[in-house]
């Protein structure tokens, strides 16, 4: 064992050892993985870890450091079955699989696991999702079940219900999500569900007893996140087309006429216009308007001159166009998106962290977990993701405990869906932190008695 556990890690270790199946809700880069490995390293039965594909590498690094045997269940169904059988022949060790892996390998549910760990466990927050049903209906005989995440309630406090049904078989005494929702929530508009006041109290108490909750500030490891939002106006012609699309579900701009009758299609088209490209734009097309890329170039050649920077994108087309603009200005850059093979992604990340590229462009879905881009102290959001989990995960890609602060620069087009997303992210973050801080306070009070 090379690394000594920090004080808060030792406290978490004792909590998890005493409580058994638990939630482990601490922020990223605080060593959740190491605590779990130390906790379960003497287990004689196999241990299953389910994590985002991009986070599996971090587990492997820590398992190697701790000299623990591991097996990765990746590849085709035939390959996974063979690897699982070979690994189980040894009777113990760690088995790592991506969060979609159950579709190719449902036999996971039939293995006599000693422990099952869901890393970034908010992937089972939706009670209707097949992945949620798979993990909450199976593994009931596994003696130790854990959910790990820094954001257990990214959109709502209800996000935690199915996570605790996985770990404990119930949440506040309710064994399924729908009975919990019926008894514990109310709705003012017939659609949005909110916890009743008494239910909120019960939920805070339940979480404080059944999860270890800690943020960086409470652990003395806080890194200040400095946010400097840049508001960038559309040109009048594009603004007029945007407003018509928002009102009439039709995009009319020059020779372009597109109908977006479905809400999701309209929403995607509105976001695309905000990023500077047409919704239906094919590979090789240019900018519809270039306000954001000009702002980015001004920053890279001005305030951020000589600095390494991460730039986040929701859409691939503007990312490719930005790469071309940077090349034209002789600013060294690399990029990772879904088209880049996994091995090549890590090579490009290594190159960036080694100083071989000044800028790295990242598609949010590819880079939201498991990668480290700590060579940069600044992240620019060409488009902000609508989900709090993705936003916080992306922020933490450049975070190191040793840093005093990091700079986050969202690009926002005023009075658009982008502006709505920007404001909603702030509200979601405040709501999530308020609840978890109360759970932390309760646990601290219990511990002092």
Per-range role (PLM):
Residues 28-29, 142-157:
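Conserved helicase ATPase motor motifs in RecA-like P-loop NTPase domains
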Residues 73-82, 98-104, 125-128, 313-317, ...:
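Conserved helicase motor
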Residues 35, 44-65, 154-159, 315-316:
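Conserved Walker A/P-loop ATP-binding site and its immediately adjacent core
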Residues 96-101, 106-112, 130-143, 173-285, ...:
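Inter-lobe coupling linker of SF2 helicases/translocases
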